[in-house]
């Protein structure tokens, strides 16, 4: 049986830390779905269509990576897709408590789904989408922290605000 994994997140924006986890996950699992969360409570920098477009473009040459969207409970989505594994990235100890709680709740909701934690390459351990958005909003450079396409789209957004 092929192993299907789901890597969920808002990916607003997609960072090189995310890309690192996804590409390494693609080597570990037969297929990995980048599942972009629809969250009506957040005001995203990029629209859902933009985030999907970016992710599909970044992984266009990696056939084992699929990009999809979901809303609602992650374990319900994972079950509907027939996946066996949730992939989560851990950058620092500060991520662990939240991820630990989420994993325990997911296990309670569906014992058939496993969670695998992956550490990003050390050069990406401090990068988060929130930090990228903050640096961008204050006029800072994010080169090397996000895929080139994300950097271009950020520049476009900055130009539209001027």
Enumerate the predicted regions with their spans.
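Nucleotidyltransferase catalytic core that binds NTPs
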Residues: 1-162
